[in-house]
Amino acid sequence: MTLSPYLQEVAKRRTFAIISHPDAGKTTITEKVLLFGQAIQTAGTVKGRGSSQHAKSDWMEMEKQRGISITTSVMQFPYHDCLVNLLDTPGHEDFSEDTYRTLTAVDCCLMVIDAAKGVEDRTRKLMEVTRLRDTPILTFMNKLDRDIRDPMELLDEVENELKIGCAPITWPIGCGKLFKGVYHLYKDETYLYQTGKGHTIQEVRIVKGLDNPELDAAVGEDLAQQLRDELELVQGASNEFDHELFLAGEITPVFFGTALGNFGVDHMLDGLVEWAPAPMPRQTDTRTVEAKEEKFTGFVFKIQANMDPKHRDRVAFMRVVSGKYEKGMKMRQVRIGKDVVISDALTFMAGDRSHVEEAYPGDILGLHNHGTIQIGDTFTQGEMMKFTGIPNFAPELFRRIRLKDPLKQKQLLKGLVQLSEEGAVQVFRPIANNDLIVGAVGVLQFDVVVARLKSEYNVEAIYESVNVATARWVECTDAKKFEEFKRKNEVQLALDGGDNLTYIAPTMVNLNLTQERYPDVQFRKTREH
């Protein structure tokens, strides 16, 4: 049975994000993946701090200075018979809810682990988020050109700490200066590594079969024997790859390689296009939407300000869930119940924009936004429904923002509200005074906010500590009790960027006592957009 042209396009799409701890090599992998997708001809090396060859996916000013990826960029490239959408997420020490929300827009994730260090803190946090939706995970053990931990130990650690079975697809031969290549367990082939080929796609020498004398000649008898011994162990002790279990998020195929040396990345990409799911169905508040439906639907998972310093604009990123986008089509923005014509949607190659004529499920569109689109907005061709599961998290860190020039209060508020709509930070306006408090998931966000207020809104601000330990969104079905709660706790109440009532607690003890005192009031840690 031949599929209709529309369904063929849907079946070709793969949408994934990379999750990792800072410095595990995520940006380098992104580069190499794009190199294989022929999207960039020579891969820009990330770190040379002053070098002009910046990695292609880190494009905001502050990222260029610090060598880290702060904003989620989107890149589309062809690979084999598929069209792959890669959503790049911030990888540095400190990241924002952007990262969490980006994971709601993908169908699959690649987990990158520094094989010298194993599972690290940020990887754990991000894996918890993918678990909420049982997202399928592929794993790349990176940095084999350095000395690494024992590969079996690494697999055990992933299984025990992240509660997901490991099915090795390739297996390393040596590491560090002795790294010779990898053996593919399912193809019975050894791929030999050559150094110094990191910037290009190399012709790899392949040796067929484990008992081939060529293997001993190529890697040395000791390493060849070690490989055979290890493989006996591996085949006895580890999981076989099982596609059903992979799609259920219970087992992860594991690849070994070095992104810097551009080796092993293609094996992982082959696995991605072969095994990762085509665009998946999504829940709304009324029904499940399937990718094969012909009517257009999509949701906004991120807003990015000023992608183009020349045009002080903001762009809303929308994941297409079903149907085909065509230039100039009419869509309904469900939250405000208004029909809009979208004639100038964008696709991205990190920072380079091109206008798009059509897009399919799994693709990410950029919509020009003049303040009317919010995170979590659903667009349809008229049906009134809302996609669910796009979270807002209660921040864990708080600072008061203070102006150096008090006359700029209006610009400051405008800047903070726009940054909060974008999800870069959350802003709270206490009811009892004129303070402006910002809340974030990580410390670096405060620096980002101050830098962006200055460069984009021309506002000089500083942040200082404030007596807030945590925040909760509050609501109550009993209006009378809610009024009493508001009257007695006015000092602790604030409005967030979307004018939702929030309780800002000076200590956790205060929060617990208040919750006990007002059992009818709900204190929420997350809020649906």
Swiss-Prot record:
In this chain, GTP is annotated as bound at: 20-27, 88-92, 142-145
GO BP, one annotated term: regulation of translational termination
Residues annotated as domain tr-type G: 11-280
The record ties this protein, via Pfam families, to: EF-G_D2 (PF22042), GTP_EFTU (PF00009), RF3_C (PF16658)
The protein's matches in NCBIfam families, at most eight in alphabetical order, are given as: prfC, PRK00741.1, small_GTP
PANTHER family named among the record's database cross-references = PEPTIDE CHAIN RELEASE FACTOR RF3
Give the protein family: Belongs to the TRAFAC class translation factor GTPase superfamily. Classic translation factor GTPase family. PrfC subfamily.
Q: What does this protein do?
A: Increases the formation of ribosomal termination complexes and stimulates activities of RF-1 and RF-2. It binds guanine nucleotides and has strong preference for UGA stop codons. It may interact directly with the ribosome. The stimulation of RF-1 and RF-2 is significantly reduced by GTP and GDP, but not by GMP.
State what protein this is by name. Answer: Peptide chain release factor 3
Protein's organism:
Citrobacter koseri (strain ATCC BAA-895 / CDC 4225-83 / SGSC4696)
